[in-house]
């Protein structure tokens, strides 16, 4: 009889610990994703712009509707600036087993970046061909255009200070991308 009571107490404690850990993990995950652009802005990265762009499209929420922008979060995550007709997307690469970023420009040029936002290839959809020499393209200028095209969302997200600051966890989780 005493043994059963001890076992019940132990099971209750284990359940409480599991619930507490699940709650902490859930709150932390929502905090990190919801404030990822803020954390990127305040990270020790030497290039916060690229990190902010990556976090914006990776962690966009369906409820993040803003005037002048439309969102797609089923499958590949995509943000469209409807006034400039440009798209920023994050999803599974068709050419390899990695994820990639894509910036689709209204002139028919599609820029594809790797998981660290380094330019991989350029596709001209009007001519149905890939550019062979991407070294002649000013990658920094393209990234600056992306930042400017999505600046209203980025600026708002940069200023959205989290309730609980988990900057150190963000820096640890994204340490490979913070350079």
Place the predicted regions along the sequence by residue.
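N-terminal export/targeting and maturation segments
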Residues: 16, 21-105
């Amino acid at each position: 009889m005493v043994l059963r009571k001890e076992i019940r107490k132990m099971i209750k404690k284990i359940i409480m610990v599991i619930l507490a850990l699940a709650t902490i993990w859930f709150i932390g995950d929502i905090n990190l994703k919801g404030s990822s652009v803020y954390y990127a802005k305040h990270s020790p990265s030497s290039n916060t712009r690229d990190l902010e762009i990556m976090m914006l499209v990776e962690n966009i929420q369906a409820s993040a509707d803003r005037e002048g922008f439309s969102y797609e979060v089923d499958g590949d995550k995509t943000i469209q600036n409807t006034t400039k007709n440009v798209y920023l997307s994050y999803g599974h690469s068709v050419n390899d087993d990695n994820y990639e970023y894509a910036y689709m420009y209204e002139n028919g040029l599609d820029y594809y970046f790797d998981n660290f936002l380094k330019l991989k290839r350029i596709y001209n959809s009007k001519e149905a061909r890939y550019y062979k020499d991407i070294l002649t393209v000013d990658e920094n200028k393209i990234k600056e255009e992306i930042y400017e095209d999505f600046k209203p969302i980025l600026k708002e997200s940069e200023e959205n200070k989290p309730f609980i600051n988990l900057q150190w966890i963000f820096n640890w989780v994204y340490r490979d991308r913070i350079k």
